[in-house]
Every structure is written in structure tokens, then in C-alpha cells.
């Protein structure tokens, strides 16, 4: 029985692995001392045995001398050798971590670590939500490979510092070798393609900072369909679609759909973030993921109509993450709503642009109805990807932006939202938490928005509005659980009035029963006395 168990674990290491892996959380002090500057990932990918083999090189800076270096790598992959600054080092690989002790001490400053490794990586159980590798085939029987690892972290296939607070500031190189006839779609620019003895090597390079979970590649029998795109700032960038050969006829229309999305996203969030490289999408066997400059797309061209034109919700949402996740990145998974909620708000903004304000309002009303409100959006600090993840970080996060728009007004809200997406202090090498967003919008508003942020992001409470009829035609209205006055639309017999209401009751005159916040700008509870 014991021997059978060992064999089972060796042959099928992926059964429970992905569900047990988490990304982020409390940052290990030894890893906090490491500033990752650059990754080089060189792998041979063999679909016939579902294996990877190669090495990782990490350039890093130590803030102070260290007794050891610590990297993350799943146990199902085997470390073969490790070198630090060209010298072979001893190591220990346990609990999904690699520990590299120094003979005496690693000096502060620059270090180069090379880790040779390989094996059969974890299989994605339910990609992209429970991630890992997918070894699929297209309808013609060709290998079709994808990686998704947002929840688990990139440690599912390469040694890394698995925490959202640190990205390789100087970018990354991916050198991926696959059987000849297949193509590799990766991040950044394709610098070199070479062929040798039945294998093809694709060298992808990005000079931008990039999240670990976006540092992935896709493999398939792809055809590259491309065009030039002129950004809102007048810059030319290549728009590329790595489409399965069997779906190549769909590619041009799909790029039309993508281009419409890009125009709207640039309008609200500023120029496409990666103009020095490309706009990229790759067809994948899973639904999709926001992999930087090579978004994963697997919605099978299931378009709906928006403004009378083809629209793909999945394509638009994942592409919106180029701004919200890839350019503006949460420092701690606890604040994941910044990436998912604001990106989801971008899903509503394209409805506004293509179908009008009324359609946008209806969408946000439906979003309000869909909010579960079982857990706060922000549940604490230094929590991992699994602890923070639930549906409301999307919908309720988006609805909170809708509320902010109403409270601030369009003249303040939209420029401030664009500033969050474009100001260097919030973007690229810099990461953000909720306090940064609150401070930015409060400064723009001229008053503290802390009570509003606290109520809707840190609790599951709804805005409580007290309504009391004090006379035949008079009503007293007050806000019970918010320590700041806010505008509220009130419908009376003479029409709709926008009135600023706080904890002190306001008297409203109306011959008919009043309606409070009829268009639903707040998640609220009305209490009638």
C-alpha cells in the first residue's frame, strides 16, 4: 500500500497540488531583502511527455547581507543545480521553497542566481481559476499548451519570488524551445527565432516590469495575424493575434473587436501602457487571463452586440487588465479589488460609450443586485490570493467606482480615475493599496472620503437611510451609518432633486410619497419609521 502511494504521487503529482498553492500573503523577511531586477527563463517544452527542462536566471539586489537566498518553486519540479555569481551552491528544496545558504554571507548589492531544474509541472485542474499547465490538442490534433497561475503564482513552473509587491523592474527574457511546427506566443517582443534538429526556439523579451503570473507563454499551431494600431497619443504599436490556424478566418474581425475596446479604454484610462512592445492576444484552451502584452483568449468568439457592433466581454475585460493589474498593480493581494473592481468598471464604461448612459445605469443596477455582500472587499492586510478572492471584488468593486462617480461628479471623477492609471507614482514600478486610491480621490474632492471607502470596502454594511413622514406632505431623511454628508437623489411631486444629506435630518416637502436614490447609485438599506 505504501509503495502504491509513492508511485501514485510520482506519476500524478498534480491531483491536489494546485488547490494547495497560494500566492502572496505575509512576505518572508528573507525575501523582502531581495529586490528582483530581471528574470531569464529558458525551457525546452516536450508535449509528448508533458515535461519542461531548463533553467532560471535571476538578477537581484540584496538590501543588506543575507545568510541565505529564498525562492519559490513547487515540489513537483526537481532542482538539479544552483549557481550564485557563477559558483555552484548547495541548496534545500522543501515546502515549495528553495533555500540557498551562503558559506558565510551573501553581500549586499547585486547577485546573479542560476537554477537548473525540470520535470512534469502541475496540471491545471480548472484553468484559469485553479491553474497550472494545460496540455491540450486543437481540433486537428496539434499540441495546444497554456499556463495560468494567478492564484498559485509562477512557482508552478519557474523559481521566483512569489509576491505581488516585487516585479522584475528591468523585465524578463523567455527562451522557449518546442517541437518544430509549433509556435510560442509570449510577452514583449520576439527577438529571435531559430531552428535546430526538429526543434524551434523562440526568444521573447520584455523590458517592462511584469507580474510573475503574467510571465507565461502559450504554445500551439498558431498563425500570426497583425496590424498597426495608432494610440490615443499618436504612437504606432503592433496589434498581434496568435490564432489557431483552424480559426484564422476569424482573426481580422476579432482584431476589429479588440480595437474598439482599446479605443474606449484609452479614452478613460490613458494611452495603451506597452507601446514600445505590442498589443497581443493568444488563443488558449482556457477562458482567458490578463497576461501582459499577450492576453489569453478562450471565449470562442461568442460575440454579443453593443451599439450594433460585435462585442466580446471576455476579450474586453482581460484587455482592460493591461491598465488595471499590469500597469496599476496591487502591492498586496488584500487590495485585489483595485485590479478586478476597476477593470470591471471598465466593462461598464464601454456599455456607456457604445450603448449610452441609460444602458450603463441599467448595467450598474444589475451589478448592485448581483452583489453578495458576504465578505468585505478588503479583509485585512498581507493576505494571500485565496483568502482575498471572491466575486464581490469584481462587482462590488466596480459598483463602488460607480458610487464615487456620483459623489464626486464627472468633472472630478473621470480625470482622477485617469490620473490613477497614468501618474508614475501609481504605475509600472510602483504598486498601490486602497489607502493610495482613497487619498488620491479625497484630494481631488477636497474632503476626506475615508468614511465612504470604509463603509463599502472594509465592511459588508449597506448605506442606511432613515425616512420618517412628519406631516402629510413632509418627510425627514437622514443617513445613519456614514460620518459624512453625501448627495442623494430624491423624487418628489415636483421632480428629482439632488440633496446633500448627512446624519442631521433634512426635511423634504412632497405631495406624493418620495423615492430615494431611484437610479441606484448606492448599495443601501431604506429604513421607514
Task: Name what the model sees in each region.
Residues 56-58, 110, 114, 163-165, ...:
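Zn2+-dependent metallopeptidase catalytic core
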Residues 114-222:
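Extended, low-hydrophobicity, Ser/Thr/Pro/Gly-biased non-transmembrane segments
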Residues 78-84, 185, 449-450, 470-521:
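Beta-strand-rich binding/interaction modules
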Residues 18-53, 136-144, 450-451:
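N-terminal, polar/Ser/Thr-rich
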Residues 74-136, 505-510:
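A surface-exposed beta-strand-loop module
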Residues 340-399, 403, 407, 426-427:
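Acidic/His/Gly-enriched intrinsically disordered linker/tail segments
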Amino acid at each position: 500500500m505504501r509503495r502504491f502511494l509513492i508511485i501514485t504521487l510520482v506519476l500524478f503529482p498534480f491531483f491536489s497540488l494546485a488547490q494547495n498553492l497560494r500566492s502572496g500573503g505575509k512576505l518572508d523577511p528573507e525575501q523582502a531583502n531581495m529586490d528582483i531586477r530581471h528574470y531569464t527563463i529558458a525551457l525546452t517544452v516536450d508535449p509528448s511527455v508533458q515535461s519542461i527542462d531548463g533553467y532560471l536566471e535571476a538578477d537581484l539586489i540584496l538590501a543588506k547581507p543575507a545568510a541565505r537566498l529564498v525562492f519559490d518553486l513547487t515540489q513537483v519540479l526537481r532542482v538539479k543545480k544552483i549557481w550564485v555569481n557563477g559558483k555552484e551552491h548547495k541548496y534545500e528544496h522543501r515546502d515549495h521553497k528553495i533555500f540557498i545558504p551562503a558559506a558565510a554571507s551573501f553581500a549586499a548589492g547585486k547577485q546573479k542566481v542560476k537554477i537548473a531544474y525540470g520535470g512534469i509541472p502541475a496540471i491545471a485542474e480548472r484553468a484559469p481559476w485553479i491553474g497550472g499547465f494545460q496540455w491540450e490538442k486543437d481540433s486537428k490534433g496539434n499540441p495546444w499548451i497554456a499556463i495560468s497561475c494567478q492564484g498559485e503564482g509562477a512557482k508552478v513552473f519557474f523559481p521566483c519570488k512569489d509576491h505581488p509587491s516585487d516585479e522584475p523592474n528591468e523585465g524578463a527574457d523567455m527562451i522557449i524551445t518546442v517541437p518544430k511546427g509549433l509556435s510560442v506566443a509570449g510577452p514583449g517582443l520576439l527577438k529571435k527565432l531559430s531552428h535546430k534538429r526538429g526543434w524551434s526556439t523562440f526568444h521573447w523579451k520584455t523590458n517592462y516590469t511584469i507580474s510573475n503570473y503574467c510571465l507565461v507563454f502559450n504554445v500551439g499551431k498558431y498563425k500570426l495575424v497583425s496590424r498597426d494600431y495608432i494610440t490615443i497619443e499618436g504612437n504606432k504599436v503592433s496589434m498581434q493575434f496568435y490564432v489557431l490556424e483552424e480559426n484564422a478566418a476569424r482573426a481580422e474581425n476579432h482584431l476589429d473587436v479588440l480595437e474598439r475596446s482599446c479605443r474606449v479604454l484609452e479614452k478613460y484610462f490613458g494611452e495603451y501602457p506597452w507601446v514600445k512592445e505590442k498589443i497581443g492576444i493568444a488563443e488558449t484552451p482556457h477562458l482567458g487571463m490578463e497576461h501582459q502584452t499577450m492576453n489569453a483568449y478562450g471565449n470562442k468568439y461568442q460575440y454579443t452586440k453593443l451599439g450594433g457592433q460585435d462585442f466580446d466581454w471576455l476579450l474586453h475585460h482581460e484587455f482592460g487588465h493591461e491598465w488595471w493589474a499590469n500597469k496599476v498593480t496591487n502591492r498586496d493581494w488584500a487590495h485585489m479589488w483595485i485590479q478586478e473592481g476597476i477593470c470591471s468598471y471598465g466593462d461598464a464604461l464601454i456599455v456607456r460609450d457604445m450603448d449610452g448612459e441609460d444602458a450603463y445605469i441599467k448595467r450598474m443596477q444589475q451589478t448592485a443586485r448581483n452583489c453578495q455582500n458576504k465578505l468585505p472587499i478588503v479583509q485585512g492586510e498581507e493576505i494571500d490570493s485565496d483568502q482575498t478572492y471572491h466575486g464581490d471584488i469584481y462587482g462590488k468593486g466596480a459598483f463602488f467606482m460607480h458610487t464615487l462617480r456620483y459623489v464626486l461628479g464627472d468633472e472630478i471623477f473621470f480625470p482622477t480615475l485617469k490620473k490613477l492609471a497614468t501618474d508614475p507614482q501609481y504605475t509600472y514600478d510602483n504598486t498601490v493599496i486602497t489607502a493610495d486610491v482613497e487619498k488620491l480621490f479625497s484630494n481631488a474632492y477636497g474632503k476626506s472620503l475615508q468614511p465612504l471607502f470604509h463603509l463599502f470596502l472594509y465592511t459588508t454594511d449597506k448605506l442606511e437611510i432613515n425616512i420618517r413622514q412628519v406631516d402629510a406632505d413632509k418627510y425627514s431623511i437622514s443617513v445613519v451609518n456614514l460620518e459624512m454628508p453625501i448627495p442623494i437623489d430624491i423624487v418628489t411631486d415636483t421632480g428629482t432633486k439632488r440633496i446633500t444629506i448627512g446624519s442631521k435630518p433634512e426635511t423634504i416637502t412632497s405631495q406624493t410619497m418620495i423615492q430615494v436614490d431611484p437610479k441606484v447609485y448606492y448599495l443601501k438599506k431604506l429604513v421607514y419609521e
